[in-house]
Amino acid sequence: MNVMNEILEKIQAYDTIIIHRHQNPDPDAIGSQVGLRDLLRAQFPQKRVLATGYDEPTLTWLAEMDEVKDEDYEGALVIVCDTANTPRIDDKRYMTGDFLIKIDHHPNDDAYGDLLWVDTDSSSTSELIALFAKELDLELPVSAARLLYAGIVGDTGRFLYPATSTRTFEIAATLRSIPFDFTALARQMDTINLKTAKLQGYVYDHLEIDEHGAARVTLTQELLKKFDLRDSETAAIVGAPGRIDTVSVWAIFVEQADGHFRVRMRSKRKVINEIAKRHNGGGHPLASGANSYSLEENDQIYQELQEVARTNEG
């Protein structure tokens, strides 16, 4: 029996299923979480299937969370989607259910859960949920197809990143054949507000780039207040430095309210997630996140990125 069949058996065995995802969600986190919820609701209308977590204001157009009570976890199956390690799981009640399943595509550095399905070759967790439906012959409702397509598009950078495979395109084509409003979804995913556009201009104006293509920019709390932006809204400009031809690796340091920095790191070709692991983070080889607790640590992270950029140059 493969892992997908094992997961389906567990789903069939429980009356209540609660689905989690990571903090500071992106389209793949919400797409896989709520896409799975809607898939299971369509297949098992007699079951209670709930999605929990903080409603990210910039993504409520994609989906909103359910109200989940403490007592809902009694005897429940809990599934965590798109979350590499336990500190990043949104809503710590995930520990209070009866059985825990992890479904993810990040490196499996934290093998939590009673049953795990981790495929690091997958472009996204949304791709895995769509594959789950396909392989087990489960009919996807329109709402789930829309969510899973959004998750795939989000995590592949519109099919730009290296994890985009033949299977990714095949699954995306299958989802696209289901009649959700593709044009409206694509337009929404490509839209930023004026405040974010101005921040992007600031990033280009203030980006520090060394001779090897390592780049960085720091966004302070004062700057975020000036642009009237939340930390979550800065996610829209993370890819901006990569559009510059001379940039190969980059980091955006975003100061948090408590003074520490959330660090978003990206690379065009060279592996950077080992740097993230050394600084309270992790992620994919070319797209990772870390945490820094001083300006000196910011400098250290940038120096490590510079070293990566220098290594095997070209």
Give each language-model segment a name.
Residues 35-37, 95-98, 118-119, 170:
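Glycine-rich, phosphate-binding/catalytic loops in enzymes
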